[in-house]
Amino acid sequence: MKIQRKFYEKSALQVAKYLLGKILVNEVEGITLKGKIVETEAYIGAIDKASHAYGGKKTERVMPLYGKPGTAYVYLIYGMYHCFNVITKVEGEAEGVLIRAIEPLEGIEKMAYLRYKKPISEISKTQFKNLTTGPGKLCIALNIDKSNNKQDLCNEGTLYIEHNDKEKFNIVESKRIGIEYAEEAKDFLWRFYIEDNPWISKK
């Protein structure tokens, strides 16, 4: 069942944990692609020097961060890789959760082709293990790009997140990745992942 807006109307720190184990879905050319969310990071604009909206920054690029909970914020890093985030809490407060890694569940053949431009039978074991183990990788595998920016994940669109409460797991809290510039914020334990899951980006 698709997650509705009330789920996202909490702090990014809460939602980042709640999203672990949930299922990220995208429909691509009639094929359903699904992956279990196994790693997330929380960003809180007001107090977080790692956030694009730190200090109330409002540029055209970051305005989606101020959107209503349950909408997508998709941006480019290094000019070539997309990152997919979900807006949380309340409209106007710039809180969001970065989806860092997923465990492929359905439509894996299509994911492999999107990632490597060849059939799954022709990719190596290393390539398969790296299919969705990072924010840019999962966006390629699920065909998420800037066209999904500001998309409402709670309506009838092709991109959304489903409930999945069948699995029990431990959550590891750690420092976020790649934000060495963020002064004291680089030490916040705002990265969360499922303990011992092989699909996380790094331990």
Curated annotation (Swiss-Prot):
The alphabetized list of GO BP terms reads: base-excision repair
**Its Gene Ontology molecular function terms?**
alkylbase DNA N-glycosylase activity; DNA binding
Q: Kind of enzyme, top EC level? A: hydrolase
What keywords are annotated for this sequence in UniProt? DNA damage, DNA repair, Hydrolase
One Pfam entry name: Pur_DNA_glyco
Q: Which SUPFAM superfamilies match?
A: FMT C-terminal domain-like
Record has Heme as a keyword: no
Q: Does the keyword Signal apply?
A: no
- Name the InterPro entries for this protein: Formyl_transferase-like_C_sf, MPG, MPG_sf
Coiled coil start-end = none
Q: What is its EC number?
A: 3.2.2.-
Q: Which domain of life is it from?
A: Bacteria
Q: Which HAMAP family match?
A: 3MGH
To which protein family does this belong? Belongs to the DNA glycosylase MPG family.
Q: What is this protein called?
A: Putative 3-methyladenine DNA glycosylase
What species is this protein from? Clostridium tetani (strain Massachusetts / E88)
